[in-house]
Amino acid sequence: SYSMEHFRWGKPV
């Protein structure tokens, strides 16, 4: 899931 936890690094991982 692409939540805020994925986007904390600046890229969707």
UniProtKB/Swiss-Prot annotation:
PTM annotation, UniProt: About 50% of molecules were found to be acetylated on the N-terminal serine.
Valine amide PTM sites in chain numbering: 13
Annotated InterPro entries: Mcrtin_ACTH_cent
GO cellular component entries: extracellular region
Cystine crosslinks: none
GO molecular function: hormone activity
UniProt key word Secreted: yes
The keyword Cell wall biogenesis/degradation appears for this protein: no
Modified residues (N-acetylserine): 1
Keywords: Acetylation, Amidation, Hormone, Secreted
Subcellular location per the Swiss-Prot or TrEMBL entry: Secreted
Pfam families assigned: ACTH_domain
Family: Belongs to the POMC family.
The protein's name: Melanotropin alpha
Organism for this UniProt entry: Camelus dromedarius (Dromedary)
Lineage: Eukaryota, Metazoa, Chordata, Craniata, Vertebrata
